[in-house]
UniProtKB/Swiss-Prot annotation:
Protein's name in the database: Putative uncharacterized protein YBL073W
Note: Partially overlaps AAR2.
Amino acid sequence: MLKMNDMNVSNGDVLDSVKWLILLDIKGILIDPYSYLNRSRCKWYSIHCRLPIFYFLAPCPSDKEDLWCPFISLNPKPLKYSCSCVAIFSAFKMCPFFISWFL
């Protein structure tokens, strides 16, 4: 189970990407980054919790290039990444709904 001390919140760093995606997957928040329903779910969470930044992590296969997500990306070439995303913890603190999944 994710605890606050598992995260580096001193400078807003994201928890280790792989671990974070596994935790999201276990909770059913993000399962298939190429699924329309899951991309919509990501968008719902970003709006509901006012999360300003999502990281695009997984390289997108060429046959999936039409499935971009309209989120802000810190990557200088966001179109090369899919909608696998994790939220930075500093934004999570604004959303008790999200935190309740893990605490």
